[in-house]
Each structure stands twice: as structure tokens, then as C-alpha cells.
Curated annotation (Swiss-Prot):
GO cellular component, one term: extracellular region
Bias-annotated ranges (Polar residues): 1555-1568
Species annotation: Rattus norvegicus
Domain EGF-like: 123-163, 164-204, 205-246, 247-287, 288-328, 334-374, 375-412, 415-455, 520-556, 564-599, 607-642, 650-687, 695-732, 740-774, 782-818, 826-861, 869-905, 913-948, 956-991, 999-1034, 1042-1077, 1085-1120, 1128-1163, 1171-1206, 1214-1250, 1258-1293, 1301-1336, 1344-1379, 1387-1422, 1430-1465, 1473-1508, 1516-1551
UniProt entry tagged with the keyword Metal-binding: no
Gene: Megf6
GO molecular-function term, one example from the UniProt record: calcium ion binding
Disulfide pairings: 44-108, 74-80, 107-120, 127-138, 134-147, 149-162, 168-179, 175-188, 190-203, 209-220, 216-230, 232-245, 251-262, 258-271, 273-286, 292-303, 299-312, 314-327, 338-349, 345-358, 360-373, 379-389, 385-398, 400-411, 419-430, 426-439, 441-454, 524-537, 531-544, 546-555, 568-580, 574-587, 589-598, 611-623, 617-630, 632-641, 654-668, 660-675, 677-686, 699-711, 705-718, 722-731, 744-755, 750-762, 764-773, 786-799, 793-806, 808-817, 830-842, 836-849, 851-860, 873-886, 879-893, 895-904, 917-929, 923-936, 938-947, 960-972, 966-979, 981-990, 1003-1015, 1009-1022, 1024-1033, 1046-1058, 1052-1065, 1067-1076, 1089-1101, 1095-1108, 1110-1119, 1132-1144, 1138-1151, 1153-1162, 1175-1187, 1181-1194, 1196-1205, 1218-1231, 1224-1238, 1240-1249, 1262-1274, 1268-1281, 1283-1292, 1305-1317, 1311-1324, 1326-1335, 1348-1360, 1354-1367, 1369-1378, 1391-1403, 1397-1410, 1412-1421, 1434-1446, 1440-1453, 1455-1464, 1477-1489, 1483-1496, 1498-1507, 1520-1532, 1526-1539, 1541-1550
Residues annotated as signal peptide: 1-27
Biological classification of the source: Eukaryota, Metazoa, Chordata, Craniata, Vertebrata
Entry protein name: Multiple epidermal growth factor-like domains protein 6
Length: 1574
């Protein structure tokens, strides 16, 4: 209907509702919304689809048989009543629903109606709820809203979601070089060599010199835009880093023209000279300084000038001292260099021609100074210690672990036998172990927790009421016996008995606790199931009986070391470190040991695993039995003990140091370290001189001098009284330095100065004074006796008290220290070169540098840091921070680009930029210019390097970086970004189309369209709704046309009608499809095939009427029923032909046969052997039995029964199905199950079946022979075997397995030690060497064999083998019963080893050790006694002196050449030499000869074989062996070497000229440069 009519109808309904409402109070009439009308503001019309129901008529038809009168088909009558099928039609109605469009009025989007308002006048804030669905900001408008996105994002098509804007896609984002997009923004990047301008888009070339001067110290030269190089100012050169500059060294070329030293100072070359030279007048050449002429040499005798130095010389008879200046008299005496302070050596000192040679005793070595002896860590060099080693000063000490003690050799360790002392605290037995011991108990006992006491395994205790003893097994009950077992079967029985009697009264403890229910353990938590490792339970099930080798409460612990056997109660008898097998006790011997008990160690002289390796130790040294290392006797050392101790060492291995005073001692005994003193000394360490009146070796001789005359303690000669200051036989020798007085017996007490040889008065050197010369000269004095006055030293210098020269302070030089150091030098004597660089000034005293402007650092090597300038960079720059830096020298500001002014505090004036503000800006459209780079900052709407380009379409604002936010491609203002909407769009973003019924620019025009037509928002053209046409859509579609503007033709066929709007066809009955072109599908009928048939089982539906046409086998209105039984086929008109009561299929008529039948009509029974449903089951009857074809039940033959005839007839029955009872006379008869004939039962035979089967036969009629073995009997009925004790198996053919016995082998043997038991009785059959009920004991020591019945016949300590009685002889014995001792020349076990003794040595039969005769030693007596020893065992010390050897047998001394006498104590008399002093010397008269070689010992001035020739010219001294050192043509004395000067020469070597001549030389011009060098 028209809109207004609908509105009026709605108003009527509302008015009627208001009239029917009950009356309300007049005071508060309710405000109800006014119904919306299209004329009200902001009201929009909508088409709403609703379901509308209405009745639809439907014509139905059905058929029935009615009686009718008819004329045909009547028999003899004209009319008759017949049956006729009639179709009846009737009208019915159904409710049909269809969707209809209805116009409703609602508030336009963005508006709402409040009570009392006419129309929609209230704006809706869509942003208040869930932000309006916007991802970004939500903006509410009057009547609507819109979503916005943050800058850099844009709205997607849904108007709500924001998506990142890739600004780089449009004009590269305005970037000059590279644009990088980021979420919500972007950034510009520049190529290498460019930098980004302040606008963030423009790239400026980097002028590398403008940034920090390019890193250059002086000047930066720009090569390209990005490249530069550094350049130095004149007189400077570039360093390797290419940036810093250093001044060119003037000394680099030609040493600056200097002869010696060239040094740069403030850029100029300054020459210097080496010490001993001075600069000449040209300031470049160096000339020698004559130290002798200037008095700088300070030589005691004479001075000789040399180039650059000088040399002091001494007069004849004197020699130059170590200081190179003092001269000392030459004493013609050979001085022992070791006498003074032991030559500086810490231990031994030996005098040589080159000075003292230090030596160290054994265990020490020389330190780097070659004088001090330091200890050697002997333990690190594999000493002889067997266990532990501790290093000591000069040696080491061996020690042993607990349970061991040190052997007498000081190296090896021997086990301590703890059992030897107090029985080791053991109650029963004690067995010594290596390093320890172990207690053991007798059989039937076990060790207590203290591992010493013994507790009985089963204790017999007399009950308190006096009844018989009862047994309580341990460990459940702790009860002590009232008697003590005897520990040993020896002579101590009386003592043990006394001790037992004493203790009986104390051992009366009763039980502690008892475990119940066959449990045991300290907490009764263990049972027999816990026994491990083959352990079995005791008969009382109160503990585990462990096998050999195991112990512990549950047999989970192996035997402790050195124990074995049952309960680990047997002690191991292994010796020499052998280990014991925990089960059998067999010994496993270590290398070098053999024998059943490891009792056979290696004999002396052999070692190794099998004692086959021969020791190589000399001097009777003993050998380690495993490794063969030699263990030396005292006085010997070396790998083979073949070396005698070196001097000053003694003891085993020469490991001890002699404590003798070596300078006073002749020798140290290498065995015990006793000291043999030199003549003149005595004491244990030879530390004391002979007492007055005694002399000689040991001070045993008394002096024979007159009273008051001293005696020489060495020779006993009487000393002569010399005048003070002299000594010697003829008193011709002056006292040596440091002594004075009579016989030079006084010692000087001067401090570093000599004394007068007569009076002892100190002779002070220059600069010293005082009685002992210990004081320096007073201030202002110097020289001998401090008599000279010091010169006037300047600048705080002091005077040298020895020479009087001024000692200048650092920084000053000159004879009076009046001059400061030359430029470039500083310190004491101005000898240290300054290290100041870059024109830095050096302090002459400290050398500290004062840097030139622009430099700093300790050596002025570092340029000023940025922000500082001036000397030492002490001034801060006064330039504006960040706008410029200052010159490091002058401090003037050097402005950065874009700044100017004295302090770089001003930016460039407008329109200019760059360094010094000299470049002009090029910006357009009023853009601002950067004063540093000249880059332009564009105003809104412009872009480009110079702002010459307007913003591209879609962008606006500053830098055009804002994207327009307009919809539908609307442009925006380039400056403000506001959207310019085209026709048909409106809103801030032009996102909204014109409201309904409006169009054009700004939606200002009204549309004139009807019938639901829409209006084009741009042109106002009407777009008609489907089914209408015309300019204003007022014309309906003509028939045959439909759709929008009625442009489509209808396609309906077969009488179908067409809808003018959608073109849909309405089909008649029986047709369907879009164009009614298809007949109804099966199951559907009526108009449009909209009704469904309900035909079942494949019935066909009539497409017009819906009636069902049923298939074969089915019937009923809907074909829902199958044919009745006995019928089948179409309309169920055919009848079944099945037999045996079988039914047939209602469609095909096929027969369903019952079980046991088959065939087309079920007329045949199942074939033989098959039965059941479809005859598919196979009969299970025996071959001779048949089964029923229906049930499968078997028809059994006579004698069998059961479902499968598997059971024979029960005894007493027979026949078919076992239905008959047997009629046999008694139980000894059996009935045949098939025929019932009676025969004898199994196990019986004979007439009347009364006789049992004889032994060995069984079965019916006793026809079968028994097959039982080993005495087994068989059952007479079944033949089953009954085995006797000791056998088992079906035929008793198997003997009991080892360890079991008795009937069915059900009992376990209790034999020990692996013994077998009798399989019948269980009695143990012990192997030879074992005895006891359970074979748990070995044979006693003197018994052997089976049952230990045989007595051993071993003698001399031989051990008897418990099995066969064979004897194991101890060392040194042989024979079947060890009855023979080893014959001569043989030794060891069974005397199998052959002796190797030499030099008539005899062999010890046990170990094979050789017993050497006098003069020989060694394992085989192969060595004669070492030097210094003789006699039996080389134990006697030779008393020969002078190191002479003695005869090793007799001890007679064999004197060396030059000595004779019984002990070689006498030297050869004058004129004799050689062995025994029997040869005569052949020397000039009065000349002695060497007592050994006989060579003549020429006095000074003589030479030749017989010393009968004078020295030739230029030679002097003893044997003329010294060369003269005389100059000036002088000759030297052939005896003393003193020079005899000629031609006015003087000095000790006659090379000095008189003083008048030397003083005439010119003095040097520059005394400040003098140097003293020698």
C-alpha cells in the first residue's frame, strides 16, 4: 500500500491502544516515542522481509470400488449389480508461508530518537562503544563518525583498519638519495661521502677537511669531495700515521757535521763528544783530554795518557791494584787463594793458578755465582727409598709407612711383626700381614666387632636349673662359654689353663635377645631368602652358612685380606708379599718370589720375576729383588756401588757430609765420617790448632825449642825472633798488609787503610783522618792528613775529600761547578741527554720538559687536545662551544662552517652559509636556508633541494610528508590537506555518499524516483527496482518481461507463470525446474514437484497423483509390507515350492533350508561327514563313527562314548554307548569295553587272575618287561619306575647331581672344600689332604693323603704336601725327604742353582751368597778391595798417607813417587825422587828437583834442564818464565823483573818522563767538558 496509508493505519492502532490502556495519574503522563514518519527529520525507510502465512487450497483424489448397475456381463438378466472402481476428488487447505517486503521507518545511521521527540533529533556517539570499531582514533560527527589513522598510516577499504603507508613509493619519499620505509614513517639515507642535511632529505657532500681539520695536525688539503691529505708546515715532516707532524732532525744527514755525537735542540744540531774527549774550537771536532796533565787521573805512581782515557803505571817492584790507581809491592810468594775467607766459597775451595775454585759436597750444587752451594732435591732423582723420601739439606732421609720400619741399609722397609708383641691383642690366632696384622678364630668361632675377640657360632650353656646343655645358635643369642679354647698346642698350655681358670668366674652372661619366626640380624629383619653368593641357611633358619671365601651376615662380603676358607677363619700362610686366594688359600707370589707359600725369594745376586736376572752390584752391594737396583754399603755409591765416596762424603750411598774443618783436615773416613787432621790441628772436626808446645799430626809431638821461643805447630821448627816489621827465615820479608810488630804477629785495626809495619799506626789515605782512619776530612779540607783547602765551589757543590775537586749538583759543570748544563743535557755532570721534542726546553737539573706552544706531554710529544692551546697546552680555548676550535699555538678561533665572529659565536647572516659564510643561498618560494650547509627548509606545499617543486598529488604540508586522508580518490589542499569532494560525495574525508533522495555537488539536489527506486548520487538518474520501468519508475513490467527496467524475457515452459521482479517460474503439477522444463523426480509430485511421496522399498510414485506402484515382493499403500509366508513376486501373486518346512524369499522365491538339509527345494540331507546350517560344519567323529546330519551328534562304535567318541567305556561298562555292565567275577579281572569279555586285569595273571605279576614284569597278563635301571622297581599295573636313593629319572637312569643325595635326590650335601658326597647316604667323600665330617679341615702339618692317615717323612724343616706327601725342601736342602744338604758349589731350592764365587770364595748353601776371602768382595768375590781398604770383607782401613794405596790382602802401603816409609809418611830427601825415592836428581848445585818427576825447580834468574843457564834478555823469574815489561830501552832484573831506567825515564816500567816536560803542554780550553775514564 502507499506509505501514507500505512502510516495512517499505524496511527489508528496506536490510538486504539491508548484508549484501551487503564487511566494513569494525570500528574506524570509518560513520555513515549512518537511513531516515526517519513516526513520527520533524519527518518529513513527500509524494506524489511517478513514471513507471511496464508491458506492454500489443495485438490486431493482417492479410488474405491462401488456397486453399480450395468447391463453388460449379466447372466440371463438385463441388469445386474457389478463392481466398478471410481476416483473421488475432494478439496483441502494447507498453511503456506512466503517472504514479503514491508516498508518500516527507522532513524538514519548516526541518529536516535529520545522520548518526546518527533523524529530522530539526537546524535549517536558511535565512538563511545568499542572506539567505533576503529583501529586508530575515532571521530564522531553529527549523524555519523569516521575513523582516522596516525601519521604514516592510511585507512583500508573497511574504513576502520589502518595500514602502513610506504612513503618511499611516491617520489622516493622526497629523499635525494635512498629512502627507507619504517612502520608509520620513513627515513632518508645518503651515499658514502655525503651527509644528511637538517631537512632530513637532502644529501650534502662531505668536505672532509671541514670536520676537525680532517684529523691533520697542521694543514688539510682537500683533494676530492671525500678525500684529503695532511700537509706539514716548513721544517716539519709527516709521520707514519699521515696526520701528525714532527720537526725534521738536523742530525739525520751527515750526523749534523758532528765528529762524535749530534743532538737536536730547538731545531738546530748541537755537537758533543764521548767521555775523554772535548769539543774543539769549531764546535764540531772532538780532541783528546789529557787527564794526566790536568791531574784528573790521580795515579799513585805514574800516569800514561791514551786516546780518550789514561793508564796508571807503578814503579819497579810494585803492581797496579784493582782500582787501577793504587800501587802495591810485589811479594815473591805463592799465596793460597783459598786461605782468605775460604776464597769466597760457601763450602769447598781449591787453589788454582786462576784463583779459587769452589766445590760442593754430595747433595749440593753450585749456584749461579759459582761460589754458593745450594741443596739438591735428592728425592726428585729417584733415590733408593722404597716407600717415603724426605729431602734434607745436602741429602735425604728415607721413611716407611705405618706397619713398616726402616732397614739397616736406610733405604728398604721391612714389615713390623705385630703378632710378636703381645700376640697382637688377638684372642685366638694372630697372623702378620704386610704393613698390618689380622686376628683369626678357631673353627666354630668368629671375630667380634673389635676384630680381636672371638665369639662362638653355637654356644653350649648349662641351664640355670642344672639340666642338660642346650644349643642356642648365634648371632641371635650372645652367650659366652664358661671355658676358653686353647689357642696353641704348645708348651704354653699351663699358662693358658691358668688364665682360663681365672676368667671362668666372669663369663656368666646369659642371652641378650632372640629373633623369632626364622628371622635373624641385628634388627631381626633378615631371612634365609637374603643369603647371597651360594650361602645356605643354618638348620634352624637363623642365619646364613657361607661358602668358602665369603663372610658377612648374609654372605655378601669377601674374606678380608690374608684370610680364606670357611667363615674366612683360615689364615693365609703366604710370605714375602704373596696374596691368598679367598676360597682355597692358594698363594699368588709377587715377581721374584716362588713356592707354595712364596717362601722362596731370589737368592743373593739374582732378582726378577723368576730370579733369573743377575745383579751387577760391586763391593758386596745388595740388590733389590724386584728391580735389581744396587743398595750400597757405607763408603760406596754409584749405580753399581762401584765408586768410593768422593772427598768429604761418607755413609751408605755417600749420603752424609763430613763435618770436618776441610782446611785443617787431611781426609774424612768414607764409612763413618771420622776426621784425620793435618799436622798442627786437633779435635773431632780438626777445628783447633795444637796447644802451645805441641806440633805435628794430631798434635802428638812435643816441641824441643828453648824457653820463650815459639814452635811451628806443623813442623815443630823453632821460630827465629825477627825485628818489628819483618819476618822470614832471614827476616828479609816485610810484614804483609794488615800485620805489624815482632814476627808480624800484630793485626792492624785500621778501617780500610794500611798500618805502619813496625808500630801499627794507621796510615790514612787522602780524605781520611782519625786514629783508625774511620773519619772523613772536615768540611773545607781534603788530601793527605786533610791538610789541603778546598776550592770555592759554586751552586751548592761540595768538595771531594780525597782529590779536592768540586762535586757538582745535577745541572752544573766546571772545575768550580760554575757553568750550567749545555742545551739538551741535564743531570749530574750534564751527562744525560734531554728527551724534549718539538722545541721543548729541558730543565738542566731534573730534565723536565717545558713544552713550546701547541705541545704537551712528558717529552712534549703530544699535540694539544681540542679546546686547549699555548705552552704545555695550559690555556683553554675561548671559542663558542661546538662552533669552532682554536689554533693550538696562537689561540685564535677557527670557525666551523656556518659560523663567524671573533669567538665563532654568530651564525651566518641571512642568505649566506658555509665556511666563512661566503656562499649564497639558492632556496625558492620563501624557503629558509641552513647557515651551515645551505640546505633549504621548504614551506608547506613545496619540496626539492631548492623548494622548486610543489607537493605531488596525494601529499601536503611541510616537506610534503603528510599523505592526504581523502576517500574515493578525492584530492586535498597541498597546504592544509583538507579534502575537495567530487559530486555525490560529502564528509570531511569525502567518505560518505549523498544521503537518500539527494545528489550532485555537496548533495544539494532532490531526487524524483518512485517504487523503491534509487537515485544516482552524482547525476540524479533513477535506478528502478526490479519489476518497474520508466523515467521515474512508475510503470510495471508487461507480461513476459521481468527484472531491472523490465529488460529480461521470461523462460517459463509447460504452462509455468513468470514473476515480474525476479523472473522465477511457478510450475504446474508434475513439472519442476527453473523454467518448468523437468518432470518431477521419483518421490516427488504435484505442482512444482513440491510434495514428497512416502513409497518404501523402491516403490514408484505417480508424479501427478502421488500413488505408490510397489516392486516384486512388496505390498501395501506405501509398499511397506513384504509378501505373506508362502508367496512371492509382483503383487505377491506367486506361491513357494520349498519342502521340509523351509520358507522362501519373498522377492525371488528361493528356499531357506533348515539345518541338515540342502537342494533347490531342501529335499536332500547333508552329505556324510557334514551337518548343520547349510551343511557347512564338519563332523568330529572317529573314522569308524558317523554323525547326525542335523545335530552333528556322533554314533560311537562299541566301547566308546562322548560327543566325539573320545572316551573309552568306564571300568565295569562296555558295548554301544557303554550301555552294558560287565559281569566279571572280581577286581583282579578286566572287562573288554567293546565285547564285554572278561580277562585278567593289569598286574595279574594265572588261573582265576589271582597271581600278581612277578618282579620285572607288568601290564595285562604280565606281558611287558620292566625297564627300570639301577635297582629301581616298577609298578605291576602301569610299569612306572620307583627309584632307590641316589637315582632319579623315568627309568632311574640318572644319578643324583653333584651336591644332592637321598630318595629323589631331595637332600643337599653339606660337604666343604669342594668334596663330593655319597648320593645315597650323603656322607662326604673327602679328597686327599682333607678331613672332617664335612671335609672342612685340612690335614695336620705332619699328615697327608686320604683321610690324613699317612704320616709325613720330611726332614730339616721341609713342608709336606697334604695331598701326596711330597716334600718341599727349604733353601739349602735336597732329597726326597730333604735329608741331604747342598753339595759344595750348589745352593738354593732343591740345590738346583750353581755357585759363581771367584777367587776361592765359598758359597752359602741357602742364599748362594759368596763368602769372600781377605782382599776380595762382590757378589761373586770378583772385585779386589777398593783403594784404601784391605783384609777380610775389605773392612780394614789402610793407614797409608799421601793417598797411597795398600795391598788389598796384606795392607802393605804402596807409596807413590816422591814418598817412602811404612805409611808413606816421609817425602823424598833433597837430591832424590821417584818411587821409593830411589832415584837421584841431576840438577845444578843447590837446585832442588821435583820429588815425583825429578824435574829441576829453577830459582829466579836461572833456566835449563839442570838450571845451569842464566835468563836471556827480556825474561825473568823462576825458570825465566816471566816476560819483562820495561820501556824506554830499559833492562829488567832477571831475578825480580825490576826495570833499570835510562835516558831520564822513570816509573816502574820506565815509561814516564820528568814532570817539567809534561807540564809544558797547553791546557784544554773547555774544562767543563772534561771526563775521567780508565
Amino acid at each position: 500500500m502507499p506509505v501514507r496509508a500505512e502510516a495512517r493505519a499505524a496511527w489508528r492502532v496506536v490510538a486504539l491502544a491508548l484508549l484501551l490502556l487503564p487511566a494513569m495519574p494525570a500528574a506524570s503522563p509518560p513520555l513515549t516515542p512518537r511513531p516515526l514518519q517519513p516526513s520527520m527529520p533524519h527518518v529513513c525507510a527500509e524494506q524489511k522481509l517478513t514471513l507471511v502465512g496464508h491458506r492454500q487450497p489443495c485438490v486431493q483424489a482417492f479410488s474405491r470400488i462401488v456397486p453399480v448397475w450395468r447391463r453388460t456381463g449379466c447372466a440371463q438378466q438385463a441388469w445386474c449389480i457389478g463392481q466398478e472402481r471410481r476416483t473421488v476428488y475432494y478439496m483441502s487447505y494447507r498453511q503456506v508461508y512466503a517472504t514479503e517486503a514491508r516498508t518500516v521507518f527507522r532513524c538514519c545511521p548516526g541518529w536516535s530518537q529520545k522520548p518526546g521527540q518527533e523524529g530522530c533529533l539526537s546524535d549517536v556517539d558511535e565512538c563511545a562503544s568499542a572506539n567505533g570499531g576503529c583501529e586508530g582514533p575515532c571521530c564522531n560527527t553529527v549523524g555519523g563518525f569516521y575513523c582516522r589513522c596516525p601519521p604514516g598510516y592510511q585507512l583500508q577499504g573497511d574504513g576502520k583498519t589502518c595500514q602502513d603507508v610506504d612513503e618511499c613509493r611516491a617520489h622516493n619519499g622526497g629523499c635525494q638519495h635512498r629512502c627507507v620505509n619504517t612502520p608509520g614513517s620513513y627515513l632518508c639515507e645518503c651515499k658514502p661521502g655525503f651527509r644528511l642535511h637538517t631537512d632530513g632529505r637532502t644529501c650534502l657532500a662531505i668536505s672532509s677537511c671541514t670536520l676537525g681539520n680532517g684529523g691533520c695536525q697542521h694543514q688539510c688539503v682537500q683533494l676530492t669531495v671525500t678525500q684529503h691529505r695532511c700537509q706539514c708546515r716548513p721544517q716539519y715532516q709527516l709521520q707514519e700515521d699521515g696526520r701528525r707532524c714532527v720537526r725534521r732532525s738536523p742530525c739525520a744527514e751527515g750526523n749534523g757535521g758532528c765528529m762524535h755525537i749530534c743532538q737536536e735542540l730547538r731545531g738546530l744540531a748541537h755537537c758533543g763528544c764521548h767521555p775523554g774527549y772535548q769539543l774543539a774550537a769549531d764546535r764540531k771536532t772532538c780532541e783528546d783530554v789529557d787527564e794526566c796533565a790536568l791531574g784528573l787521573a790521580q795515579c799513585a805512581h805514574g800516569c800514561l795518557n791514551t786516546q780518550g782515557s789514561f793508564k796508571c803505571v807503578c814503579h819497579a817492584g810494585y803492581e797496579l791494584g784493582a782500582d787501577g790507581r793504587q800501587c802495591y809491592r810485589i811479594e815473591m810468594e805463592i799465596v793460597n787463594s783459598c786461605e782468605a775467607g775460604n776464597g769466597g766459597c760457601s763450602h769447598g775451595c781449591s787453589h788454582t793458578s786462576t784463583g779459587p775454585l769452589c766445590t760442593c759436597p754430595r747433595g749440593y750444587e753450585l749456584d749461579e755465582d759459582q761460589k754458593t752451594c745450594i741443596d739438591i732435591d735428592d728425592c726428585a732423582n729417584s733415590p733408593c727409598c722404597q716407600q717415603a723420601c724426605a729431602n734434607t739439606p745436602g741429602g735425604y732421609e728415607c721413611s716407611c709407612f705405618a706397619g713398616y720400619r726402616l732397614n739397616t741399609d736406610g733405604c728398604g722397609c721391612e714389615d713390623v711383626d705385630e703378632c710378636a708383641s703381645g700376640h697382637g691383642g688377638c684372642e685366638h690366632h694372630c697372623s702378620n700381614l704386610a704393613g698390618s696384622f689380622q686376628c683369626f678364630c678357631e673353627a666354630g668361632y668368629r671375630l667380634d666387632e673389635d676384630r680381636r675377640g672371638c665369639t662362638s657360632l653355637e654356644e653350649s650353656v648349662v641351664d640355670l636349673d642344672g639340666r642338660l646343655p642346650f644349643v642356642r645358635p648365634l648371632p641371635h643369642i650372645a652367650v659366652l662359654r664358661d671355658e676358653l679354647p686353647r689357642l696353641f698346642q704348645d708348651d704354653y698350655g699351663a699358662e693358658e689353663e691358668a688364665a682360663a681358670a681365672e676368667l671362668r668366674g666372669e663369663h656368666t652372661l646369659t642371652e641378650k635377645f632372640v629373633c623369632l619366626d626364622h628371622s635373624f640380624g641385628h634388627d631381626c629383619s633378615l631371612t634365609c631368602d637374603d643369603c647371597r653368593n651360594g650361602g645356605t641357611c643354618f638348620p634352624g633358619q637363623d642365619g646364613c652358612d657361607c661358602p668358602e671365601g665369603w663372610t658377612g651376615i648374609i654372605c655378601n662380603e669377601t674374606c678380608p685380606p690374608d684370610t680364606f676358607g670357611k667363615n674366612c677363619s683360615s689364615p693365609c700362610t703366604c710370605q714375602n708379599g704373596g696374596t691368598c686366594d679367598p676360597v682355597l688359600g692358594a698363594c699368588r707370589c709377587p715377581p721374584g718370589v716362588s713356592g707354595a707359600h712364596c717362601e722362596d725369594g731370589c737368592p743373593k745376586g739374582f732378582y726378577g720375576k723368576h730370579c733369573r736376572k743377575k745383579c751387577h752390584c760391586a763391593n758386596r752391594g745388595r740388590c733389590h729383588r724386584l728391580y735389581g737396583a744396587c743398595l750400597c754399603d757405607p763408603g760406596l755409591y754409584g749405580r753399581f756401588c762401584h765408586l768410593a765416596c768422593p772427598p768429604w762424603a761418607f755413609g751408605p750411598g755417600c749420603s752424609e757430609d763430613c763435618l770436618c774443618e776441610q782446611s785443617h783436615t787431611r781426609s774424612c773416613n768414607p764409612k763413618d765420617g771420622s776426621c784425620s787432621c793435618k799436622a798442627g790441628f786437633q779435635g773431632e772436626r780438626c777445628q783447633a790448632e795444637c796447644e802451645s808446645g805441641f806440633f805435628g799430626p794430631g798434635c802428638r809431638h812435643r816441641c824441643t825449642c828453648q824457653p820463650g821461643v815459639a814452635c811451628d805447630p806443623v813442623s815443630g821448627e823453632c821460630r827465629t825472633q825477627c825485628p818489628p816489621g819483618y819476618q822470614g827465615e832471614d827476616c828479609g820479608q816485610e810484614c804483609p798488609v794488615g800485620t805489624f810488630g815482632v814476627n808480624c804477629s800484630g793485626s792492624c785495626s785500621c778501617v780500610g787503610a794500611p798500618c805502619h809495619r813496625v808500630t801499627g799506626e794507621c796510615l790514612c789515605p787522602p780524605g781520611k783522618t782519625g786514629e783508625d782512619c774511620g773519619a772523613d776530612c772536615p768540611e773545607g779540607r781534603w788530601g793527605l792528613g786533610c791538610q789541603e783547602i778546598c776550592p770555592a765551589c759554586e751552586h751548592g757543590a761540595s768538595c771531594n775529600p780525597e782529590t779536592g775537586t768540586c762535586l757538582c749538583l745535577p745541572g752544573f759543570v766546571g772545575s768550580r761547578c760554575q757553568d750550567t748544563c749545555s742545551a739538551g743535557w741535564y743531570g749530574t755532570g750534564c751527562q744525560i741527554r734531554c728527551a724534549c721534542a718539538n722545541d721543548g726546553h729541558c730543565d738542566p737539573t731534573t730534565g723536565r720538559c717545558s713544552c713550546a706552544p701547541g705541545w704537551t706531554g712528558l717529552s712534549c710529544q703530544r699535540a694539544c687536545d681540542s679546546g686547549h692551546w699555548g705552552p704545555d697546552c695550559i690555556h683553554p680555548c675561548n671559542c663558542s662551544a661546538g662552533h669552532g676550535n682554536c689554533d693550538a699555538v696562537s689561540g685564535l678561533c677557527l670557525c666551523e662552517a656556518g659560523y663567524e665572529g671573533p669567538r665563532c659565536e654568530q651564525s651566518c647572516r641571512q642568505g649566506y652559509y658555509g665556511p666563512s659564510c661566503e656562499q649564497k643561498c639558492r632556496c625558492e618560494h620563501g624557503a629558509a636556508c641552513d647557515h651551515v650547509s645551505g640546505a633549504c627548509t621548504c614551506p608547506a606545499g613545496w619540496r626539492g633541494s631548492f623548494c622548486e617543486h610543489a607537493c605531488p598529488a596525494g601529499f601536503f604540508g611541510l616537506d610534503c610528508d603528510s599523505a592526504c586522508n581523502c576517500s574515493a580518490g578525492a584530492p586535498c589542499d597541498a597546504v592544509t590537506g583538507s579534502c575537495i569532494c567530487p559530486a555525490g560525495r560529502w564528509g570531511p574525508r569525502c567518505a560518505q555518499s549523498c544521503p537518500p533522495l539527494t545528489f550532485g555537488l555537496n548533495c544539494s539536489q532532490i531526487c524524483t524516483c518512485f517504487n523503491g527506486a534509487s537515485c544516482d548520487s552524482v547525476t540524479g538518474q533513477c535506478h528502478c527496482a526490479p519489476g518497474w520501468m520508466g523515467p521515474t519508475c512508475l510503470q510495471a513490467c508487461p507480461p513476459g518481461l521481468y527484472g531491472k527496467n523490465c529488460q529480461h524475457s521470461c523462460l517459463c515452459r509447460n504452462g509455468g507463470r513468470c514473476d515480474p521482479i525476479l523472473g522465477q517460474c511457478t510450475c504446474p503439477e508434475g513439472w519442476t525446474g527453473l523454467a518448468c522444463e523437468n518432470e518431477c523426480l521419483p518421490g516427488h509430485y504435484a505442482a512444482g514437484c513440491q510434495l514428497n511421496c512416502s513409497c518404501l522399498h523402491g516403490g514408484i510414485c505417480d508424479r501427478l497423483t502421488g500413488h505408490c506402484l510397489c516392486p516384486a515382493g512388496w505390498t501395501g499403500d506405501k509398499c511397506q509390507s513384504s509378501c505373506v509366508s508362502g508367496t512371492f513376486g509382483v503383487h505377491c501373486e506367486e506361491h513357494c515350492a520349498c519342502r521340509k518346512g523351509a520358507s522362501c524369499h519373498h522377492v525371488t522365491g528361493a528356499c531357506f533350508c533348515p539345518p541338515g538339509w540342502r537342494g533347490p527345494h531342501c529335499e536332500q540331507a547333508c552329505p556324510r561327514g557334514w551337518f548343520g546350517e547349510a551343511c557347512a560344519q564338519r563332523c568330529l567323529c572317529p573314522t569308524n563313527a558317523s554323525c547326525h546330519h542335523v545335530t552333528g551328534e556322533c554314533r560311537c562304535p562299541p566301547g566308546f562314548t562322548g560327543l566325539s567318541c573320545e572316551q573309552a567305556c568306564q571300568p565295569g561298562t562296555f558295548g554301544k554307548d557303554c550301555e552294558h555292565l560287565c559281569q566279571c567275577p572280581g577286581e583282579t579281572w578286566a572287562c573288554d569295553p567293546a565285547s564285554g569279555v572278561c580277562t585278567c586285569a593289569a598286574g595279574y595273571h594265572g588261573t582265576g587272575c589271582l597271581q600278581r605279576c612277578p618282579s620285572g614284569r607288568y601290564g595285562p597278563g604280565c606281558e611287558h618287561i620292566c625297564k627300570c635301571l639301577n635297582g629301581g622297581t616298577c609298578d605291576p599295573a602301569t610299569g612306572a619306575c620307583y627309584c632307590p636313593a641316589g637315582f632319579l629319572g623315568a627309568d632311574c637312569s640318572l644319578a643324583c647331581p653333584q651336591g644332592r643325595f637321598g630318595p629323589s635326590c631331595a637332600h643337599v650335601c653339606a660337604c666343604r672344600q669342594g668334596a663330593a658326597c655319597d648320593p645315597v647316604s650323603g656322607a662326604c667323600i673327602c679328597s686327599p689332604g682333607k678331613t672332617g665330617v664335612r671335609c672342612e679341615h685340612g690335614c695336620p702339618q705332619d699328615r697327608f693323603g686320604k683321610g690324613c692317615e699317612l704320616k709325613c717323612a720330611c726332614r730339616n724343616g721341609g713342608l709336606c704336601h697334604a695331598t701326596n706327601g711330597s716334600c718341599s725342601c727349604p733353601l739349602g736342602w735336597m732329597g726326597p725327604h730333604c735329608e741331604h744338604a747342598c753339595p759344595a758349589g750348589r745352593y738354593g731350592a732343591a740345590c738346583l742353582l750353581e755357585c759363581f764365587c771367584q777367587n776361592n770364595g765359598s758359597c752359602e748353601p741357602t742364599t748362594g751368597a759368596c763368602l769372600c776371602g781377605p782382599g776380595f768382595y762382590g757378589q761373586a768375590c770378583e772385585h779386589s778391595c777398593p783403594s784404601g781398604f784391605h783384609g777380610p770383607g775389605c773392612q780394614r782401613v789402610c793407614e797409608c798417607q799421601q793417598g797411597a794405596p795398600c795391598d788389598p790382602v796384606s795392607g802393605q802401603c804402596l807409596c807413590p813417587a816422591g814418598f817412602h816409609g811404612q805409611f808413606c809418611e816421609k817425602g823424598c830427601e833433597s837430591g832424590s825422587f821417584g818411587d821409593g825415592c830411589l832415584q837421584q836428581c841431576n840438577c845444578h848445585t843447590g837446585v832442588p828437583c821435583d820429588p815425583i818427576s825429578g824435574l829441576c825447580l829453577c830459582p829466579p834468574g836461572r833456566t835449563g834442564a839442570a838450571c845451569d843457564l842464566d835468563c836471556r834478555r827480556g825474561r825473568f823469574g823462576p825458570g825465566c818464565a816471566l816476560r819483562c815489561d820495561c820501556g824506554g830501552g830499559a833492562d829488567c832484573d832477571p831475578i825480580s823483573g825490576q826495570c833499570h831506567c835510562v835516558d831520564s825515564y822513570m816509573g816502574p816500567t820506565c815509561r814516564e818522563v820528568p814532570t817539567q816536560i809534561s807540564s809544558s803542554r797547553p791546557a784544554p780550553q773547555h774544562p767543563s767538558s772534561r771526563a775521567m775514564k780508565h
